[in-house]
Amino acid sequence: MSDLLGILKQQGQSEEFDAIKIALASPELIRSWSYGEVKKPETINYRTFKPERDGLFCAKTFGPVKDYECLCGKYKRLKHRGVICEKCGVELALAKVRRERMGHIELASPVAHIWFLKSLPSRIGLLLDMTLRDIERVLYFEAFVVVDPGMTELERGQLLNDEAYLDAMEQYGDEFDARMGAEAIRDLLRQIDLEDEIRNLREELPTTNSETKIKKITKRLKLLEAFYESGNKPEWMIMDVLPVLPPDLRPLVPLDGGRFATSDLNDLYRRVINRNNRLKRLLDLNAPDIIVRNEKRMLQESVDALLDNGRRGRAITGTNKRPLKSLADMIKGKQGRFRQNLLGKRVDYSGRSVIVVGPTLKLHQCGLPKKMALELFKPFIFSKLEFRGLATTIKAAKKMVEREESVVWDILDDVIREHPILLNRAPTLHRLGIQAFEPVLIEGKAIQLHPLVCTAYNADFDGDQMAVHVPLTLEAQLEARSLMMSTNNILSPASGEPIIVPSQDVVLGLYYLTREKVNALGEGKIYSSAQEAQNFYEAGHLDIHAKIKIRMPKEDGETGYHLVETTVGRAILAEILPKGMPFDYINRTMTKKVISKVIDSCYRKFGLKETVIFADQLMYTGFKYATRSGASIGIEDMEIPDDKASIIEHADNEVREIESQFRSGLVTNGERYNKVIDIWSRTNELVAKSMMSKIATEEVTDAKGNKVRQESFNPIFMMADSGARGSAAQIRQLAGMRGLMAAPDGSIIETPITANFREGLNVFQYFISTHGARKGLADTALKTANSGYLTRRLVDVAQDVVITEDDCGTDTGILMQPLIEGGDIVEPLHERVLGRVVASDVYIPTQTEPVVKAGTLLDEEWVEKLEKHGVDQVMVRSPITCQTRFGLCAKCYGRDLARGHLVNTGEAVGIIAAQSIGEPGTQLTMRTFHIGGAASRATAANNIQIKTKGVIRLHNIKTVTHENKNLVAVSRSGEVTIVDEFGRERERYKVPYGAVISAQDNSPVEAGQVIATWDPHTHPVISEVSGRLKFVDLIDGITMNRQTDELTGLSNIVIIDAKQRSAAGRDLRPMVKLVTDEGDDIYLAGTNVPAQYYLPVDAIVNFEDGSLVGIGDVIARIPQERSKTRDITGGLPRVADLFEARKPKDSAVMAEVSGLVNFGKETKGKRRLIINVSEDQCHEELIPKWRHISVFEGEHVERGEIIAEGALNPHDILRLLGVGALANYIVNEVQDVYRLQGVKINDKHIEVIVRQMLRKRVITFAGDSKFLVGEQVEESAMLQENDKLLAEGKQIARGTPILLGITKASLATESFISAASFQETTRVLTEAAVSGKVDELRGLKENVMVGRLIPAGTGYTYHQSRKAKRARAAAGGDSSATHTVTASDVEHALSEALNADNHEH
């Protein structure tokens, strides 16, 4: 019994720790771990296969090879436990102690630990203030270092080569001490007085001015303080003793054929021991210095290889030229200890099989093959068999199961009832990739899956496989049932929309069922109920599409009945509607979108149970009527429009016209290309339109004999229209024309495929089709990997974001407005704020009382109210502004999207956010090839046509008035908005430079009016004053070419690229100036800036030197480069760039301060732009000359306004415009990419990630804190320190937020375990060890790795109670925190447990 107690106690020990600390090990500590020294390189005896004594597998040091058996065989059996054999010296214990007992090697000469030497920045180098190169010269015996200068002129740490050393010896004799090798470095480290050094550096810091020096001092200071505070001693970075890994962790296993497979570590250890022993021998023999030195160097190298092979010099290779795997390689990378064993574990009780469709299942069921069930539930069956007395022993039960006796099947039925199982489909990209079902036993060998969960799993039945897992414990079963059951996962956690939505056949069936047909059998009849109509239909007296009237009960709680116009099919559908659901929800043609809306409102109105039943019924009905409809695909169904040939002929003529214009020099090649592409895009649209109108409608005769058009019953049209399968774009390729294709580089090939698939392609057309198809396949493979990596980085950065409190009490938030792009409201306000908590009261102009009070969770009813009152901006709480220290609060997060109520504490919202953003990434990347690479490019926009009536407002647009009275825009970032009579913005458009605006500011405009036009294919250069044109630096043949056209004699002036110019023209800056007739400069209105325009490469000048130019004339035009097709290929890397916060190339220059702009003296290649804030304060920027500067002399700019065009740099946005603007920017940019693909993701997921990117602060003012100016610290750490300082009445530290990319943010997390398991393991662990870091085990990863429940979900309460218990123990010395158990206690507990077991059965 006491033995059992010992085991219980042991198990208890490993559990009870609250944090993990990593530090440097002192030689004493290493010796204390060791059970003996390893003196010989031998492993096992080749004849007896027993471990050699004092060797690498020595049983005396590491423990017995067999349980409780000594090596020589004198003692065997349990009764001698703990005895040490006199003959062979082995202690009798379990053989598994060979996994935990360490040995050690006493090194004859100290060696440096390579991690602290070579891991940049070199820790040893920083401490000694020496360069890595110098230290290496000392360590590898190339130079002497002065350890103690004595009374000489030498300095401590000075390097001497052999000659200098000999000279010094002659000069000073024994007065000084200079040595080589690790011991010299060790002595130098020993001499460092940490306290003294820290004090000196702290005093030196304020007095230094040079940036680099300050950086260096702060680096050193941080390292010294880390050593000082952690209690690590610098000399421990040099090792005298080397620990030896327990032998079972570097095993030697016999293969068949008498050979052995061994871990690489044994080779590496053998080298170290051999060299060490040789060195000992040489030292005993007093060998010559040079030999000893060489041996010491070899010892240093062999220890380096053991710790981190290949870090310095060439990696040591084994027999097969493969580098040996060192200790460092064991822990890093995907196959290392962290990711392979600690974070990824394999499970038992699982099986996998192919899936097939189970259309008869209920939503919570799945079909499980009997064979699998029998195998998976074996232990349950054994215990039941024993319990019922059908088998006496487990062995007998096993036999019965193997014979598959009939009673076994009954018991299996019994065991399986209500025992949920988990189904998982790889890749598991979001939490809906594992769901729980109740198994239904089936014959056959395939798992049956319910069709409605396929969307969540992204499964299809073309050979997909799925894995089954069995939750064993009661808690696991409970969780599976209450949280993971498929019926509990109706809404997608990414967007909050239903994910249990019928698709494909079901949609087609419901669509067919609810369509109307003119003049169908029984049209116009009236029935007393839906049931009666159904009976007539079944009897064959009614067509399913016939328009009829039915007496229906009134809705909205009124009593009585009314007649409803509907069709027979819709009446049938009404039968399965939940009670109380309005009939007009389904009294229409059911497309996929409509069905999704119906399911959504059913969930909101009636809750989970009703919705699940309704969804199932919808599915059964859908399948039934899809079968009845007999819809199929026939070649005849792809109807080619009659006017296709004439449309294409017309396009051919247009293209010929443009070709001839090109030949006569009226347009450039680039313009010609763009125009041709445009013509074919438009033609494709026309053919598609014509084809759709032919396929979509048919002519029929109504009851009165008139010809009418109705929607056709063409199966292909029905499939696309209902949303079951296919799209207009695909039908266009089947029956219209395939259209333009993309070349492998993404550019569009200008000869389109005019044929469609029904007509068939010729060889040339087939060939250019293959580009797209291949590119699609190659992209898929590459991008799947990229997307998976993005998801991994996102999970890593957000893994510890958990809801930890109900309300953090902040009143800040972010301002939400509807997203307006072009004329469309891309996302209305009510969609954006749904499920958020209001941060401050919402008012409307006419009322004094707020419409919505702060702290309200906006649900469907509230947003409807906002919509009704026409509110166009709401301040809502956001994860970005949440004040919770560790984690988030429920109010700032808002609604749990998958459940529809305020989020619960303990919800792991970080992981959900990462999955929601990462999962579609993979989806989208897999989706490129479906259209087969057909180039989809919208015809280039060339005007603004407005959609609503209102008043036009111009926003920061500078215009000049052309002689024909039109306004011409001469600013880049201008916008026009249309506002309604309440002043609410309805439409917003960007106005490009050079657009001709035909309406005045603040003038009323009508819907459909065109208010601006421009040429989409060129960028114009517009004159803002009138005058004579003067060429500067435009020299024929050097900076420009005259391209004369033979046919017309017209010539164009084209600027040559600077890279292609001769040496003479390299530094010339071609530009045009406007001058008066006398040749004086003309200045822009109201400024002293001369009117001059730099001409970029390829610009075409429209006027000759000396011509007269009017205001608003186009002086030159710059052809735009060919357009590339947009798809998520650009998208996924774009998302990654945003989350990594990369600085874009040629990023926009933003104004650092608000003030007036003027230009200073130009330097070579740069312009100096000065912003004057006040008389004495100004800010200068140097901007390269080729950059287009969008502000003019004397203009007023606001801080953060764009001065030079380019991509925005997120770091600048944060610095100049603040956190809110940055959040807005990242959220909108990421959403743009996903929106393009039609993927809905809720904003708050992106906000959670942005919050994690903004965790750090850069200290701007240190106060009395321990921080240094310029240091990066966690916000929570800064707040904690400030709390402490405030309590002591000292000055607090201040810092500004800084943006880190997700990889950097993950590596900069407080938890070193989490960071080390992510990337750059060596660097993270080195840093952590030096500073003696403590991991508080706050996040999810750390807890998974130490084998605990995660502090989220159901594990959250467990962690809370542990925390409370700890606090109690700390406060009152609570005895319950430490258990002392007596043997009798344990016996009592055991007997109780055993009895309880019997009662259960």
From Swiss-Prot:
- Identify the Gene3D superfamilies for this entry: 1.10.132.30, 1.10.150.390, 1.10.1790.20, 1.10.40.90, 2.40.40.20, 2.40.50.100, RNA polymerase II, clamp domain, RNA polymerase Rpb1, domain 3
Q: Identify the CDD domains for this entry.
A: RNAP_beta'_C, RNAP_beta'_N
Organism's domain of life? Answer: Bacteria
Which molecular-function annotations from GO does this UniProt entry contain?
DNA binding; DNA-directed RNA polymerase activity; magnesium ion binding; zinc ion binding
Instruction: Tell me the InterPro entries matching this sequence.
Output: DNA-dir_RpoC_beta_prime, DNA-dir_RpoC_beta_prime_bact, RNA_pol_asu, RNA_pol_N, RNA_pol_Rpb1_1, RNA_pol_Rpb1_3, RNA_pol_Rpb1_3_sf, RNA_pol_Rpb1_4
- Reported cofactor(s): Mg(2+); Zn(2+)
In which residues is Zn(2+) 2 bound?
C808, C882, C889, C892
- One GO cellular component term, please give it: DNA-directed RNA polymerase complex
Q: Which protein family is named in the record?
A: Belongs to the RNA polymerase beta' chain family.
This protein's name = DNA-directed RNA polymerase subunit beta'
